[in-house]
């Protein structure tokens, strides 16, 4: 069973409601929703102050240690917010391939892949079906070199595999399937697609989160206050619904706004 938490501050604008809430105190409501072979215990914490009282929440959790919650939630000691980038990495790759398929002249595109730990070497093989001479920057060369040799044999296509991040400076479109933890050189007018907001400041137009439509049965289970990307991540990682990894996002978002697959393809 998955457990989610949504914290809702009391409405204290009305004086009489404020007095009533102060007497009643914080409360926790539980609703178990089932479907698709799983159950979600949706906890709603109604708070006078907007903060969580540890004792009250811990009693409601009944020993559960990992919960789904908004990243801004301040949780009691011993309770961990679920966090995984595995699903977002798949969304990033799927979005990138969707964009490449929509670009009018993909053979003229200078594509870069930044995947330091070689989480998504399959991206290179699929990209080589669509564009010419992409650059893959990785610190784990073997998986990418294996893909490069397979692509050369099956597609007659070649790619540059390197550890040098400076190679990304020549790229118009950079795909980084994992969250970026250290500075990488990207030109100012390049588009960067990644999974999760980078930990460092970078140049380029950066998109790091995704809007996705889950299958209807899972949409009905999604707790209020959680994005489909985050809830999908829990279904993918904790419940083993790996088929969700084939979903193509409707759009991607960054600090400058959002783009659909089509609009991003037209922009690059």
Q: What is each model feature region?
A:
Residues 193-268:
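Adenosine-phosphate binding glycine-rich loop
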Residues 72-77, 120-125, 142-150, 182-184, ...:
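Short, charged/polar "capping" segments at the starts of alpha-helices
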Residues 9-75:
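Metallocofactor- and cofactor-centric catalytic cores in central/energy metabolism, strongly enriched
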């Amino acid at each position: 069973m998955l457990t989610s938490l949504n914290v809702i501050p009391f409405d204290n604008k009305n004086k009489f409601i404020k007095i009533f809430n102060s007497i009643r105190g914080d409360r926790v409501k539980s609703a178990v929703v089932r479907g698709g072979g799983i159950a979600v215990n949706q906890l709603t914490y109604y708070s006078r102050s907007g903060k969580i009282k540890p004792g009250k929440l811990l009693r409601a959790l009944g020993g559960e240690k990992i919960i789904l919650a908004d990243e801004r939630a301040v949780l009691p000691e011993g309770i961990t917010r679920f966090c995984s980038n595995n699903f977002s990495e798949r969304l990033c790759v799927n979005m990138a391939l969707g964009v490449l398929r929509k670009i009018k002249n993909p053979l003229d595109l200078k594509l870069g892949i930044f995947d330091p730990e070689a989480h998504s070497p399959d991206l290179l093989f699929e990209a080589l079906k669509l564009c010419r001479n992409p650059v893959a920057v990785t610190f784990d060369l073997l998986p990418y070199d294996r893909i490069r040799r397979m692509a050369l044999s099956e597609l007659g296509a070649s790619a540059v595999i390197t550890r040098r991040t400076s190679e990304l400076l020549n790229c118009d479109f950079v795909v980084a399937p994992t969250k970026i933890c250290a500075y990488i050189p990207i030109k100012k007018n390049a588009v960067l697609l990644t999974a999760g907001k980078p930990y460092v400041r970078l140049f380029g137009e950066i998109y790091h989160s995704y809007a996705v439509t889950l299958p209807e049965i899972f949409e009905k289970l999604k707790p209020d206050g959680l994005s489909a990307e985050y809830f999908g991540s829990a279904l993918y990682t904790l419940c083993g619904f790996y088929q969700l990894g084939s979903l193509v996002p409707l759009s991607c978002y960054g600090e400058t706004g959002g783009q659909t697959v089509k609009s991003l393809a037209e922009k690059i």
